[in-house]
Design a protein with these regions (language model features):
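N-terminal basic/disordered segments at the start of proteins
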Residues: 26-40, 107-113
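Short glycine-rich or small-residue beta-strand-to-loop segments that form or flank ligand, phosphate
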Residues: 37, 68-72, 105-111, 334
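Active-site-proximal loop->helix
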Residues: 141-158
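Short amphipathic alpha-helical face segments that pack within enzyme cores
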Residues: 66, 123-127, 326, 330-333
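Active-site cofactor/substrate anionic-group-binding motifs, chiefly glycine-
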Residues: 75-139, 143
Length: 373
């Protein structure tokens, strides 16, 4: 079930195509696959043709998979990714939160790093909301991890099936919302089997990195964790092209070979800005912000039960120091991005106070009460 911005049930139907148009579209997807195999970049119009074909059931899953594999084999460009994002943004369910979007931030990761880390971004959301920021998080249940952002936030009391009207009230009363991706992107329905088949054979596709670019709330600011260093400049450029107000794309390098889709105190972090921060291109470490380097083991998470217990430990001041500092660092960066603090360093101690001083625990309790009512 999905909802329109007034909270009424809405069913998505692909736009109709006549038989001649359909034939052209089917041949176009095959033709585009051939062009990709030769190394040619797709235009925005060609991306739209391909995206529309992927949304329907007219092309076989094999044809769709061949196209996505050819695109990945060529290597998706920032322009192609931005063009795909525009198509799917236009077909997302509108939650009607435009009044908050210009002040809002999304704290999100691409996933897919297989690092087994804790749901850092979920607690960062709660710190930022406690600081007075407006947060619009967009995500899903765990796919390559045992516990995704949706899993943890649901465990903390968030109703994943809340109507847009309820979510608008959450923005007023809690300062944050979570857009559960399956409820806002019905156009993905006919793509899901293809993605599953590709994943089964270890093949990534553009859809592995598209989620953070198609938040239905359209927040003006984004702090994006990226699973691969090579994708940092591409996704920053794509978000810049999409008109994002400000933000950073970041990738943490664990030991020179492994990486994580987080900015952490245990890694050297490649960062690239976009929007107002587009001139930032740097490598950051914890020490740049007055924090200590930590072992990566401090960031490890588990399944939902384990992560809920770890959340309790963090809030009680018993969590691993590296995990606490990483949550604090990301929250401080988020505050700086949205303008709540003039520098990241200025936000570090404030974020720590909110996390460990009871404000986040109170936010979680308020969240449970809000969604239970």
């Amino acid at each position: 079930m999905v909802f329109n911005f007034q909270g009424r049930a809405q069913i998505y139907l692909p736009e109709p195509f006549g038989s001649a148009s359909l034939a052209r579209r089917m041949s176009s997807l095959i033709d585009l696959t051939t062009q990709l195999a030769s190394g040619r970049e797709l235009t925005a119009d060609e991306v739209e043709v391909a995206a529309l074909a992927l949304m329907t059931t007219e092309d076989s899953d094999e044809v769709k998979a061949d196209f996505l594999a050819a695109l990945a084999g060529k290597g998706e460009t920032a322009s192609e990714v931005a063009s795909f994002a525009r198509v799917f943004r236009a077909r997302a369910v509108d939650p009607g939160v435009q009044a908050w979007a210009s002040r809002a931030i999304d704290i999100v990761g691409t996933g897919g790093d297989h690092a087994g880390g804790f749901n850092i971004s979920s607690l960062v959301v709660l710190v930022l909301a406690s600081a007075g920021a407006v947060v619009m998080k967009h995500g899903n249940r765990g796919v390559t991890s045992k516990c995704g952002s949706a899993d943890l936030l649901a465990g903390l009391g968030v109703n994943l099936d809340a109507t847009p009207d309820k979510l608008r009230r959450a923005l007023d009363e809690l300062g944050f919302v979570f857009f559960f991706a399956p409820g806002y992107h019905p156009a993905f329905k006919n793509i899901a089997p293809v993605r599953k088949a590709l994943a089964a054979r270890g093949q990534r596709s553009v859809f592995n990195i598209l989620g953070p670019l198609i938040n239905p709330g359209r927040p003006a600011h984004v702090l994006l964790g990226v699973y691969s260093s090579a994708w940092v400049p591409k996704l920053a450029a794509a978000l810049d092209s999409l008109g994002t107000g400000s933000g950073l794309a970041a990738h943490g390098v664990i030991d020179g070979q492994r990486g994580i889709d987080e900015l952490t105190t245990a890694t050297r972090n490649r960062v690239q800005g976009f929007g107002r921060l587009r001139d930032i291109s740097a490598e950051w470490t914890a020490e740049d912000f007055g924090l200590s380097l930590s072992p990566f083991a401090d960031l490890q998470g588990g399944d939902l039960a384990a992560n809920l217990e770890l959340t309790k430990s963090v809030l009680a001041g018993r969590g691993p120091q590296g995990l606490v500092d990483t949550i604090v660092l990301n929250a401080a960066i988020g505050m700086w991005i949205v303008g709540l603090r003039p520098t990241v360093r200025d936000g570090v101690e404030y974020a720590r106070e909110l996390l460990l001083g009871g404000a986040v625990a109170r936010k979680i309790e308020a969240t449970r009460e809000f969604y239970a009512s």
